[in-house]
Amino acid sequence: MQTSNITNYERNDSSWMSTVKSTTEVSWNKLSFCDVLLKIITFGIYSPHETLAEKYSEKKLMDSFSPSLSQDKMDGEFAHANIDGISIRLCLNKGICSVFYLDGDKIQSTQLSSKEYNNLLSSLPPKQFNLGKVHTITAPVSGNFKTHKPAPEVIETAINCCTSIIPNDDYFSVKDTDFNSVWHDIYRDIRASDSNSTKIYFNNIEIPLKLIADLINELGINEFIDSKKELQMLSYNQVNKIINSNFPQQDLCFQTEKLLFTSLFQDPAFISALTSAFWQSLHITSSSVEHIYAQIMSENIENRLNFMPEQRVINNCGHIIKINAVVPKNDTAISASGGRAYEVSSSILPSHITCNGVGINKIETSYLVHAGTLPSSEGLRNAIPPESRQVSFAIISPDV
């Protein structure tokens, strides 16, 4: 914490931390909200330093915070609360989190360190707080999902309920990289995938993996393809051959899907959207996943997750790609050409954590591919901004 206005204690004095620790000896219900908030940002609400009574009081305080409306966020405000008649605001501006509150008729502010900010985020209630374009978080909680749904669906549900954003600046820097590996990436993924590990959707309609495999084969994507090659678009006859080999020709039930895929597979922007979603550099490496997990465990998060080392979880990785057609209102080039733009969301969900549940790291990239984008290294490089990646962590308790 760079300043210490929320207490009378000096940040740089060695007595500051001892004072924080000594507050556990004070009757908890006599502590001011400032003292409680100070303990939360110092240790986190799930710290083993806290007793159950203290955690209850901390949770009660944090439950008072609500997401701020968009019109309230001129200075980056993302949460607010009114506690004991005192207005408190949490703001994030240029990557720095500040706590604002009224002290009499004066507004006091405190800037939080990175660790204090993370402690604060992990202590927020399970509501969605918008922290700007890059970070939209749901406060992390452990969940028990009793369902007979397939594992990928359970994982996706849990991810949406139990996530914590991890800063990505140290792990994702693609400003100086190209897409030279993209053709090999999609070839390896599709060749190795089965229906349980990779799912591809267009406007919520699942695209069969065999259909995608036949498509990339017809496009000339194989293990020997030149990484610099610009893909040549398929003719109607080529696409029609792929469609007819995957759908019964006389079955009218598939007529809508056949017409849809026939149109999509001749659109260079769709091919760009599809192939770019497999680019390996969009996703975190396994070593970074292990490093992040070690950091989480070292900060006593295992206390919240009921960490049990003797129970193992088999490693698994699911790849979910969602492509939606969009027509931006203000893009005259798109409307004039009559083409379509595509919004892509590519998520990898590796489970590899040792615990009494399933640990998930969600690595997600979302970006827009404009109409007419050519499926080439240059076209893809221009389509995907480096700031679009985010990593989140979740725990799922097994169905018992």
UniProtKB/Swiss-Prot annotation:
Task: Give the active-site positions.
Answer: 34
Which GO BP terms, alphabetically? proteolysis
Give the source's domain of life in one word.
Bacteria
Which Enzyme Commission number(s) are on file for it? 3.4.22.-
Compartments it resides in: Secreted
Looking at the Swiss-Prot or TrEMBL record, what is one Pfam family this protein matches? EspG
The GO terms describing molecular function are: cysteine-type endopeptidase activity
According to the record, the residues making up region (Tubulin-binding domain) are 224-315
Principal localization reads: secreted
Q: Which UniProt keywords apply?
A: Hydrolase, Plasmid, Protease, Secreted, Thiol protease, Virulence
What GO terms fall under cellular component here?
extracellular region
Q: Where are its TM segments located?
A: none
Q: How does it assemble?
A: Monomer. Interacts specifically with alpha tubulin, a major component of microtubule.
Q: What does this protein do?
A: Alpha-tubulin-specific protease that is required for entry into epithelial cells and for subsequent intra- and intercellular spreading. Contributes to bacterial entry into epithelial cells by inducing microtubule (MT) destabilization and the formation of membrane ruffles. The membrane ruffling evoked by VirA results from the activation of host rac1, which is associated with the destruction of MT networks. Creates a tunnel inside the host cell cytoplasm by breaking down the microtubule infrastructure.
Family from the record? Belongs to the protease EspG/VirA family.
**Protein name from the UniProt record:** Cysteine protease-like VirA
> Which organism does this record belong to?
Shigella dysenteriae serotype 1 (strain Sd197)
Q: Which gene encodes it?
A: virA
